[in-house]
Amino acid sequence: MQLLVAWTVLRTFAALGRLEPVDEAREGIKVDAAPAAIVETHWPETGIRTRPWSPSKRIATMAKGTRLLVRGVVASRDNSGCKGKPWYAVYPFGYICSEHVKPGREQPLVGHALGERMRGERRLPYDYAKVREEGALMYRGVDGVRTGVAARSLSEGMNLAVARTLEVDGSAYVETVDGQLVSKSSVGWLGQGSAWHGVFLTDNAAIGPAFAWSSRDKVPVLAEPAVKAAQVGTLGLRERVDLLEETGEADPDRWWKIGEGRYVQAKNLNEVVFTAIPEGALRDNRLASGDDQWIDVDLGEQVLVAYRGARPVYATLVSSGKGSPTPKGNYPIWAKVASMTMANQDYEDNPYMVEHVPWVMLFQGHNALHGAYWHDQFGKRRSHGCVNLAPLDARWLFEWVAPALPAGWTGYLPADLERSVVVHVRDSSLPPDQAFFQERPIGPPDPEEEKRRQEEADERRAEAAAAAAEAVPAAAAAG
């Protein structure tokens, strides 16, 4: 069993190692024999860097207690990166400061990030609760409760990841995963999220419409493609149907034949349409090497299809941006994060917060593919700009997209986006010349753009405050 575990770990790490190659001889990195074969992280979050010095890019993060295989030790070049202490060269890639780890004895865990939390029939890695009281207070631990000093107040509708419930001086509280306390009476439990999930695709599929899910409950099925035709049945919510023959050119006159003498208006369906590999979604070198994953998101149909080369392998429903539309374009995934708290930016006026959103893949600025535990409206636009997935879909996609994060790892930030899986975002509901174009730049949020938006928000708020101040004496004089 020990040998099997070690072999599985090495196979996983070998696949990861190809992603971040370093020419150590050319860069003068001398790796000597290490005093330890395995190290264990002992900080709440520890980073792996591209080079054994500072500054160098952080490319991976892991939780406390994560074990790593060591391939050697590198003497420190400076005092700032690791306080003059040596670095460990670790598998599958990169270097970690020796101050951040301790010698370990057991092999690294086998499995996926967050996998240790997914026991039994769980669909989510944490228990979640929704704040149902405007102004509910959040405290930094038991001491905060007893001193009465709140860390912040919460808005109704914010979502918390809960570690446990406890009593403090006779009052019940929930303790969040991050160690904050909120009165239990101020929250309501959210359960395990939607049970919805997509489908695996095993057959060689032709390009074009394949099947669909009904977009609501009790969708009428008619005997002919006409609104006044006799009704011969109904479809339940998200019922899957084959798309056999299309009539009409535009809604509401577009219909699909789904069986003999059975027709449904296209506007009542989320259509799954397979497409050829779009330009820019998959580079030739990746296709030739077998690193051929890419993801198609159709905003018009609210459908996601995962591909390997020209072959679709999985399809499901999503919820994309509503008030803030999801940007169209080709976007390489710039970060994979096992879970992260999402909240409004300082320049946004409407506060929101959802703690420990699971299985996050950031593809453009703040926009991400991620699990959504707070709603069950997949197939409809709903988000702030991200692409929401049901929990089961989010986990599958996160583990499928290379690289798969090993157990204990909390994040991966590729040094070179050329190797990242591309998310191709289009909108089939728009005319062809508007359905796809590169709407935003690739990669993480642009600091200059963030600064500009913050300055605009500060100016807007200052003007509003000045107007409110002027209104007070005017109202008093009128009274």
Residues of each region from the PLM?
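Cell wall/extracellular polymer interaction/catalysis modules
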Residues: 231-232, 241-328, 441, 449, ...
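An N-terminus-focused feature that recognizes amino-terminal "leader" regions
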Residues: 22-80, 158-159
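Extracytoplasmic
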Residues: 34-36, 43-45, 83-87, 171, ...
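Short, structured beta-strand/loop micro-motifs enriched in basic residues and often containing a Trp
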Residues: 44-53, 136-145, 217-226
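Exported/periplasmic cell-wall-interacting domains
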Residues: 288-290, 324-330, 335-479
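SH3/SH3-like beta-barrel superfamily modules
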Residues: 59-104, 150-188, 233-270
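Sec-dependent N-terminal signal peptides of Gram-negative exported proteins
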Residues: 1-16
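Boundary regions of SH3-family modules and the immediately adjacent low-complexity/disordered segments
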Residues: 16-39, 82-134, 143-145, 175-216, ...
